[in-house]
């Protein structure tokens, strides 16, 4: 491997950040691969995602110049490159995007000249190798390139609209049909005439000669619903440059998989799979997917059968599938992680910190996949054998996915190898039907939302509930029902009430919404059954009107159910202490995956790979209760996000935080949290874990109770202990020893019983041999044996077979009115003519039973009654008919 060392991938990354730092930019870290501000987006797929709210005006930032290296993923939804990865020069699931941004500060002049300076002066790219494009009407950018930078006119290409549609151009960027938009200018690298392809905008533009390096977007307009463009008061700059394709150019190689970073990963993949040909495309797949999987897991995504977890599982299994194609039958993929850490860990310390967790997650998925592949292949083969037209039915592909965890793309791959295909339309129809069936109807209020137009007219609800649980002067600003907005509601109606201020906490962060009462001075009374957050900023009181009526503009008083809120606060604070204890016991790979903070209990889901032992459970419980007894003051403080992180505060995966955050500290626990809490940890009183289980691969769940609920749980357990002691004639202090003595005695009696059964069977065998009937030199035994269970029955059958060289045997064990049947065919004279499974069916049908098995052995059952005797008496005749 001969990779130029002057511009390694690592150096390119650091050069970029250093360059823009010197230009006055604040260097910000990569946002997580799971967007915190856009629920419609599966993954962060570009550098602008974390700044979307800034461009939309929903978020204000103190800094006006920013640069970063953003981790991106394109493997699901609209931006899905998965099927192309490994087989093309520049497709990846995971990639890094270099970007610099201006929020109303510098504009085209600086963006263009700095880009040229970095490319030609710092990275020493020959200017004659570069070509730029501009939007057809963007004369300003054209002039800057020609007059200020000095690019010849024959190296500047104006790009118009596609198919004549206004602003539908590769060189005009828009977030949506309306909103921020503007022209962009792109910088291309010319690989030379020996590479096929023409310049951008030409018929041959899809060739590989001209490769886009950098896209500079100038957001200067606000597109209206009628298509007109209104200049923005503060234009912005958004640029993006793919690190991998830039590295390929600077390292003088043609494909991204030839750069230093990928070559290191490919060589490791070749070592793990024992493949000598490092050009094998499967190695590219494994190398690429190792990055995507590791960074997804680092950012809190775990393999599952839905959503982002399903995409991760697909990527993992695609890599494992390619390993399987290379002949690998043992786990290998997890061993890519140390090499990945070696080449990317310095740039991403969180990858280094989570390496062990990533490896364990991948190993668990590899072991799971081996089982899935074994079972799934058997089912696939059964389905394929029945297919006459070469099309695997969509319903069967869905059954493989839904029941056996067999990814549909894997089914499609295997089908393709056999000259078949999957009915994907049928698969999607089955998937859609399942979603409809599984979608819970939900209680009133959860599906109701404000329109964007109405929301724009309202100010966010002011939450008073941190300091007070009762408040007056709450003005009704909107009323919603299942039918949408309404101006008024009357007695008996269920309606969501939005007020300008409220003491009611809206469900968020796992904490349930408050309940209570809304009232007016004229006797109006509304029962608040829940409080939900609408559009992330409005508190919706889910109510039933029990007296009077309410209309928009009314002024109400609100009272939160105080006792319930306090119980919720106990459990929320206990959740923080539990989270801290879990990380202390198991390590920093523990991360919250979900929670429920209710008045009667708390539920906490977290990343961990194995069941918790009794000793570990006791330790965790003790650690939490130690913090409770320490009676720490719960301190709550507002501070900047970076200051909070520097102070050791835990930010929860999937939560969206602003520049200023609320930090909750109690003892050694420090978390960012918007929930309600107690004053001191001692208020919790007692913390008690009541259950622990797994909820999905790599995710465990603990349920616990606090305060009076914990005391009641302990008292109930104590009551059960005394009840058990009474049943066994012991006292509570000696229950364990007494039960141990009873179980030892039981084992002794069971051994004695087995000996007696053995003697009974020996005597029974002697009796059965004496009843054997000779039919054409084949011994036929058909007998009823009262009191023998299935195990004893099979033992008797095996002993008879040892003593009868040619025999047909039917034994019926009768216990409690039920019949257990076993049949056997033994020896050359009977085998081939008499089949045990056919004989069993003949007998079983006569006693309202059924069964099955092989030609030499079968078992089944039925009901006791007069017909059993006649069925057994007829066995010899049946055998004779089949032997003749």
From Swiss-Prot:
Single GO MF annotation: zinc ion binding
One cellular-component annotation, GO: cytosol
Entries under InterPro entries matching the protein: aa-tRNA-synth_II/BPL/LPL (IPR045864), Ala-tRNA-lgiase_IIc (IPR002318), Ala-tRNA-ligase_IIc_anticod-bd (IPR018162), Ala-tRNA-synth_IIc_core (IPR018165), Ala-tRNA-synth_IIc_N (IPR018164), Ala-tRNA_ligase (IPR050058), Ala_tRNA_ligase_euk/bac (IPR023033), DHHA1_dom (IPR003156)
List of residues binding Zn(2+): 572, 576, 673, 677
E.C. designation(s): 6.1.1.7
Pfam families per the UniProt record, alphabetical: DHHA1 (PF02272), tRNA-synt_2c (PF01411), tRNA_SAD (PF07973)
CDD domains assigned: AlaRS_core
Alphabetical UniProt keywords: Aminoacyl-tRNA synthetase, ATP-binding, Cytoplasm, Ligase, Metal-binding, Nucleotide-binding, Protein biosynthesis, RNA-binding, tRNA-binding, Zinc
GO biological process: alanyl-tRNA aminoacylation; negative regulation of DNA-templated transcription
Cofactor: Zn(2+)
Comment text on domains: Consists of three domains; the N-terminal catalytic domain, the editing domain and the C-terminal C-Ala domain. The editing domain removes incorrectly charged amino acids, while the C-Ala domain, along with tRNA(Ala), serves as a bridge to cooperatively bring together the editing and aminoacylation centers thus stimulating deacylation of misacylated tRNAs.
Name under which the protein is recorded: Alanine--tRNA ligase
Record organism: Xylella fastidiosa (strain M12)
